[in-house]
Amino acid sequence: MTDRTCLSIVLAAGEGTRMKSNLPKVLHRVAGLPLVCHVVNAVRGTGKSDVALVVGRGAEDVRSAVEKIAGPVSAFEQKERLGTAHAVLAAHEAIARGYDDLLIVFGDTPLIEAQSLLAARERLAQGADLVVIGFRPASPHGYGRLIEEGGQLVAIIEEKEATDEQKKIGFCNGGLMALRGQHALALLDAVGNDNAKGEYYLTDIVAIAHGKGLNVTAIEVPVDNVIGINNRAELAEAETIWQNRKRRELMLSGVTLIAPETVFFSYDTVIEPDVVIEPNVFFGPSVHVASGALIHSFSHLEGAQVGEKAEIGPFARLRPGADLAEKSKVGNFCEVKNAKVGKGAKINHLAYIGDAVIGASSNIGAGTITCNYDGYNKFKTIIGDNAFIGSNSSLVAPVEIGDNAYIASGSVITADVPADALALGRARQETKEGRAKILREKYAAIKAAKSVSK
């Protein structure tokens, strides 16, 4: 396959009116990634392929989203909506460059897998001229039927045009196709619009190709591979299927999920073997968790790196730039953002650590805050190795605390603290014997006077 050139035409011009959204349909997300980007990733999984996007509303946004994951692509606007074959021909310029294979896919089918598309391309390599991707749903009602004779696909018949006998066929059209490049333009140009809607249907090329004596065949893929997204309910269903795939993949690779159905991953989440994830955990984009880590319940991770045997949560939040070394700990009700946490360092309770470096084996007490923002600019806090930050301390950045330094509880630290130093930044306590009794009597009298006046 590696020596066959390929053009993948991604049809992404649909209006998506049933989504009831200002956002183009193909930019809605499954697992944090736009639908169309899932499709492009699947295409790229078949080997080297140029991509031609057929776009409509939000064309530049769609193109930009795809180019973030795939690099430069060609985009062609479908100015009129005259059917699927018409949409493919919007990319006429790209097709005319000449390719061994053409893949025709839809930008709203995020669950298509690379191996399904690769199977279609392999059929082309074996001599087929046109390969249609089909599936067998539990009920074929409403789907176009794939009509086969003698091992060849001869036509696609829509439900409303099918005979009673044809309606019994369970093999249905998934819409996606692979086409030998040398025949592509001739077949597409032969599609007419002699139908009730006056549109050019891509499905017609099956009968056209068969009539020309070409080798036309179909392959079967799992039903979920060809699910199209038309509304928010179907978007949620696709999310569920994607998450279930990812959960199974991770568990089979050696990750323990205590309650799999409650853990949600992003398209690029990487979890190494021997990680344990408790219930109700959410992974945003760009998270890597190293072997042996423990993620407790109700934690939220995004843009974070978690080292070997680190421990997170429960109720912890790791934001972009959080980088935790091995055996470090971020405990309950802690937030870490754009900070490096050294080996064995502990941030156990009720803390905010932002724009900081925490040295190895340092201990950050409960209620510690790095005051990193003055309303205009961010500033950095640097804490050395084996430092102890007492509870309820405020570290006003920019500030540096040396190795083995000790910050007394309740301190507000505004100046650098040298290594091995003790810093106290709080008012001296005053204790006045008997004053509590006097205050109680005073306040009780005031309250009683207010009650009488009412």
Curated annotation (Swiss-Prot):
| Chain residue ranges for the region called Linker | 233-253
Q: Give its E.C. classification number.
A: 2.7.7.23, 2.3.1.157
**Chain positions covered by the region annotation Pyrophosphorylase:** 1-232
**Pfam families in alphabetical order:** Hexapep (PF00132), NTP_transf_3 (PF12804)
Q: Which InterPro entries match?
A: Bifunctional_GlmU, GlmU-like, GlmU_C_LbH, Hexapep, Hexapep_transf_CS, MobA-like_NTP_Trfase, Nucleotide-diphossugar_trans, Trimer_LpxA-like_sf
Q: What would be an example GO MF term here? A: glucosamine-1-phosphate N-acetyltransferase activity
Where Mg(2+) is bound, by residue? 108, 230
Which residue ranges does the record annotate as region N-acetyltransferase? Answer: 254-454
Catalytically driven reaction(s): alpha-D-glucosamine 1-phosphate + acetyl-CoA = N-acetyl-alpha-D-glucosamine 1-phosphate + CoA + H(+); N-acetyl-alpha-D-glucosamine 1-phosphate + UTP + H(+) = UDP-N-acetyl-alpha-D-glucosamine + diphosphate
Superkingdom of this entry's organism? Bacteria
Q: Name one GO biological process term.
A: peptidoglycan biosynthetic process
Share what the entry says about its subunit structure, partners included: Homotrimer.
The family classification in the record reads: In the N-terminal section; belongs to the N-acetylglucosamine-1-phosphate uridyltransferase family.
Protein name (Swiss-Prot/TrEMBL): Bifunctional protein GlmU
Q: Which organism is it from?
A: Brucella abortus (strain 2308)
Q: What is the lineage of its organism?
A: Bacteria, Pseudomonadati, Pseudomonadota, Alphaproteobacteria, Hyphomicrobiales
